[in-house]
């Protein structure tokens, strides 16, 4: 009997005393991710990148059948020659970025499945030489709900298109891709042209700006994306 896929779910940290509400939001998404993967019979493990030795993070990523890179703080702007001060800027995690970039570049080089979500999309783009808009204007977020319902349109013949040519999603971000990284192609956009998904042209590596792990849609949106990457491996 075949073994279930092993999934390494990379996130930043398990505690943010300076931002408890943000930590609770990320914990909710991590819990929904684990529940959606467990419902598929997959074996998933949360890996806090800042709380484990870098060698251990890399080892766990290599041992997994697929890696998920979750959301969190903004990517360190020094990594793409971005502005150090901008609206909404806050704490950065340069060491987490460095380790995750290594995992991502290795996944591309060795054609191992990897899915980036929100910050994970931005990290993948920067890891491969792309840049970001430091702050997007006009993205309105309600105080009682940081997730905005929107619709993205997928490019034909892409993994994202398997969710439907036009899919309703939940977003929560104030940054977005400016210049697309090497070897990546755009696979979905929002109605205002914002890049909402990318995939590598050769490796089973992709990323989405929205949150397919949002509890209300995780079973319907997260698992199909992971399955598509496993099928490409």
Predicted regions and their residues:
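Short beta-strand segments that buttress and anchor functional surface loops
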Residues: 186-189
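N-terminal beta1-alpha1 cap of cysteine-dependent amidohydrolase-like domains
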Residues: 1-112, 126, 133, 137-148, ...
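Active-site glycine-centered loops adjacent to acidic/histidine catalytic or metal-binding residues
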Residues: 118, 173, 211
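Active-site-proximal beta-strand elements of phosphoester/diester hydrolases
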Residues: 206-210
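Gly/Ala-rich beta-loop-alpha elbow adjacent to hydrolase catalytic centers
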Residues: 116, 120, 125, 129
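Short catalytic/ligand-gating loop segments at beta-alpha or beta-beta junctions
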Residues: 169-174, 198
